[in-house]
Amino acid sequence: IEVALDYMSCGLDPSKATIFIQSQISELCELTFYYMDLVTVARLQRNPTVKSEIQMRNFEASIPVGFFTYPISQASDITAFKATTVPVGGDQLPMIEQTREIVHKFNTVYAPVLVEPKALLPENEACQRLPGIDGKAKMSKSLGNCIYLSDSADDVRTKIMSMYTDPEHLLVSDPGHLEGNTVFTYLDAFCKPEHFERYLPDYANLDELKAHYTRGGLGDVKVKKFLNNVMQETLEPIR
């Protein structure tokens, strides 16, 4: 229910988009088993997304079969409905490529009935892979490092104020680093010029803010408070 509410809050119209519970469509499971005969273990092991997830979840020593084969299940979810375009983050591109391979092989072996989907990436590159608030991996419900669309204003504020920044930026006067700094990654993704007019008029744009941070004299707390204002404005219509 929560996921469906998120979908509709973001603008999906249930009169135009069908929202369903994946586990209740038994044909998807059946299609997954057919696809398993078209994919080798070696190919799954080469999938960059699978390799990254295995390392992140410490599955190297013992990989659950269900986890290992989830790219095949995703291929079923996509192809069963003849999807032509799939909105994804950058880390999911290998999944789309693997789906296209399955489609090509199925159509070659059996009949040309499946559609090869294309990936639709966000235009803003920073939105293609948002890290978790801990800065260690992408946002993931299982890792507990997410900002949820339904989070209250207080929850969002608490999470932003605990965000990973630059561990070497100990004093306000210290020069800060942008690379790997989660706060600036989120600003790259969500900040707009008008946000400076409303919440941080001392700066004309994000480039000026970054320049001040890297030369020193700008504290993490001030930047986080600005990000909180940006995120609250972004999420309020969804709430």
Predicted regions and their residues:
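A short secondary-structure junction signal
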Residues: 46-47, 83-84, 111, 142
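Divalent metal-coordination and catalytic microenvironments
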Residues: 7, 35, 91, 136, ...
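N-terminal Rossmann-like or analogous alpha/beta NTP/dinucleotide-binding catalytic cores
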Residues: 1-75, 194, 233-235, 239
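Alpha-helix initiation/capping motif
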Residues: 13, 39-40, 52, 62-64, ...
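Conserved nucleotide- and phosphate/pyrophosphate-binding catalytic cores
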Residues: 94, 100-239
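Internal, conserved structured core segments that host functional sites
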Residues: 57-106, 110, 131
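A short, terminal or domain-edge coil/loop segment
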Residues: 32-45, 70-81, 169-187
